[in-house]
Amino acid sequence: MPNFYEMFETPKIHWPITFVVDTSGSMAGQRLVQLNSALHELSNILESLAYQGDIQLSIRLIEFNTTARWVLGDAEKCEDHLDVHFSEASGLTNTGEALRLARSTMNRTCKSERFLKPVLFLVTDVMSIDSQNTFDAIDELKCAFGSHDILLRVALEIGDEWIPELEAFASQSDLIFKVDDLGHIKGANLLS
């Protein structure tokens, strides 16, 4: 039986966050180092924001190359901490499949009565192997919550290649960041 104080404790606000991370062959070497560094920095930023706002992080992470797979959480469950390290990069860049896997969580994302706008991070360094499939998956994400696009989509670019898919993915142009300059992400309104 809960004690008296637990009965009246206000539940924390949940903040659903999903990462879709490219580990294809083009990410080998220095780019994988940049990816790991960026995920560590993002973890610190998100945990700081959550602590300040008495927020419970609900984190999922999908790794993709030729196929997409869950690394943290899955369609049914989340983690409260982003703690991953990637050591291998191989295969092709199948972004569309990964985005569809992330979309499969969208109807489960907001089970809690109190939640912040879900955030979906896409981290990649190149165009996918099937751009049309990726653009279609992006359009499906934009409709994941019906007529209201409440999903905040943040694009993180590794390298200097212009990637039109990231422009189409991001909710707005100021939500496209280079992973070696994540300091600017602190100024983005992720807690909307």
Predicted regions and their residues:
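Acidic, polar low-complexity linker/tail segments
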Residues: 1-18, 23-33, 107-108, 114
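Short coil-to-beta-strand
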Residues: 9-19, 60-62, 70-75
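…and closely analogous acidic/polar surface helices at protein-protein or active-site interfaces
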Residues: 14, 25-56, 135
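DG-centered beta-turn motif at the end of beta-strands
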Residues: 21-24, 35, 61, 102, ...
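Alpha-helix termini
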Residues: 45-54, 106-114, 142-148
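Von Willebrand factor
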Residues: 69-72, 77-117, 128, 152-165, ...
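VWA/integrin I-like adhesion module and closely mimicked acidic/polar interface patches used
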Residues: 87, 126-172, 177-178
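C-terminal "exit" segments of structured domains
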Residues: 178-192
